[in-house]
């Protein structure tokens, strides 16, 4: 039996993907404590998990990336907010370790401060990764712009230029405050993005899998792809679903406000005269601002699991959580990215042929209606993604990897998804040395 402590960013989309893993660890006889936001605490406590709230100041930091005018500007705001959170996480994570006396740690990859404490603790630990990971690769485009993979000369030139522009800008933005924060507790400075995302944690549990995630020949050996991590809080049955006979379309906004309410408005208007039944959950947006047509039901929150069992399509902001949850249920997606990692998620939907993407600048009721029809025809691609998620092993595979880390056995066997001959992502210094040789 091992005492595990998990620590996440307080946003729901950061804690929900790891819940099945935590429940599986408990089923295997381990003790599990979770530090996260108040919003998730009550539901998780009802499941028997030991849940404690993170510092309330962490929850007061607003994600204001939606105010930016460009995708790059939004990413700069996002990483600056994460750095602000990180400074608060350091004493909070130290408090959690002192109270829980864990033997192994699981840390949200966006919790930069908690990760620094984990690194310095001397305990076995792992990152939980719940978004398309920004690790450079010879096989995939650079993170951030949602570029389609290209493997010809033009693609390689494009990727090199974009990597220098986007990743370089992000590194110049986030590394100075992160390294200043890390220096305060004696942690070494980070050299680049790969230093953090690929080489810092002994294990990185990546909650995704092929064919949704792009195939890479150079995954870091610390990575395990374990599937979607789809989870919903337990809820009462939705009896009204039994009366729905038309094809059901689920519309949903981000649970973390990003001003994406016009997605719901366009969907309600565009699908009002169609032979479908629309269920819209507005989440971070107040539902009182919308008119509800006769063929729709509008709520702020509903459990998505029972709805997905009946759904023909999901229209969403391309958040990683709802997108993978839909695809894990075999439901195709109409993705309308608004920012954050959503351009990357939406592009993966298209490349996997599991749905369509509609840029938010082209979001109109008529265009959305057409896109929903096109997405409904992608059920075969969604089924392939669902099969890939299931084959990755899910919570059982994640728990097994965590047990290996806790016991010191991780890395003794070749990971099943790492191609023969693959190697860890080299540091920037190593790459430059290779270029000079």
Give, region by region, the residue ranges found by the protein language model.
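Donor-nucleotide binding loops and adjacent catalytic segments primarily
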Residues: 208-313
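Conserved nucleotide-sugar donor-interacting segment of glycosyltransferase catalytic cores
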Residues: 84-156, 211
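C-terminal amphipathic helix plus adjacent low-complexity
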Residues: 100, 365-437
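Active-site-proximal region of nucleotide-activated glycan assembly enzymes
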Residues: 126-214
């Amino acid at each position: 039996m091992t005492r595990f402590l998990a620590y996440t960013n307080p946003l729901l989309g950061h804690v929900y993907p790891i819940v099945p893993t935590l429940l599986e660890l408990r089923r295997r006889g381990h003790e599990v404590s979770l530090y996260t936001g108040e919003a998730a605490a009550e539901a998780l406590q009802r499941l028997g998990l030991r849940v404690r709230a993170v510092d309330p100041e962490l929850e007061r930091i607003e994600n204001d990336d939606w105010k930016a005018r460009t995708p790059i500007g939004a990413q700069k705001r996002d990483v600056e907010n994460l750095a602000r959170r990180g400074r608060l996480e350091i004493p909070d994570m130290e408090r959690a370790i002192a109270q829980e006396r864990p033997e192994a740690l699981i840390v949200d990859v966006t919790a930069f401060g908690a990760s620094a404490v984990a690194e310095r603790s001397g305990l076995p630990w792992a990152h939980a990764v719940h978004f398309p990971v920004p690790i450079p690769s010879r096989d995939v485009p650079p993170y951030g712009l949602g570029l389609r993979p290209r493997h010809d000369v033009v693609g390689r030139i494009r990727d090199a230029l974009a990597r220098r522009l986007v990743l370089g800008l992000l590194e110049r933005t986030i590394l100075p405050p992160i390294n200043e924060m890390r220096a305060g507790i004696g942690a070494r400075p980070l050299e680049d993005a790969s230093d953090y995302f690929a080489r810092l944690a002994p294990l990185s549990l990546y909650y995704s899998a092929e064919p949704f995630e792009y195939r890479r020949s150079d995954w870091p050996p610390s990575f395990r792809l374990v599937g979607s991590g789809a989870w919903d809080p337990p809820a009462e049955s939705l009896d009204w679903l039994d009366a729905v006979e038309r094809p059901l379309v689920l519309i949903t906004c981000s649970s973390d406000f990003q001003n994406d309410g016009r997605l719901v408005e366009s969907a309600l208007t565009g699908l009002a005269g169609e032979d479908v039944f629309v269920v819209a959950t507005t989440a971070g947006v107040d539902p009182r601002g919308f008119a509800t047509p006769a063929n729709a039901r509008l709520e702020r929150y509903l459990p998505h699991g029972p709805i997905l069992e009946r759904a023909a399509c999901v229209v969403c902001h391309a958040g990683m959580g709802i997108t993978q949850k839909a695809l894990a249920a075999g439901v195709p997606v109409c993705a309308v990215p608004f920012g954050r990692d959503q351009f990357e998620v939406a592009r993966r939907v298209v490349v996997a042929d599991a749905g369509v993407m509609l840029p938010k600048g082209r979001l109109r009721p008529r265009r959305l209606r057409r896109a929903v029809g096109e997405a409904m025809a992608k059920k075969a691609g969604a089924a392939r993604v669902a099969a890939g998620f299931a084959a990755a092993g899910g919570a059982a595979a994640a728990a097994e990897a965590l047990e290996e880390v806790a016991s010191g056995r991780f890395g003794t066997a070749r990971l099943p998804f790492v191609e023969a001959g693959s190697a860890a992502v080299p540091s920037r210094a190593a790459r430059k040395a290779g270029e000079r040789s």
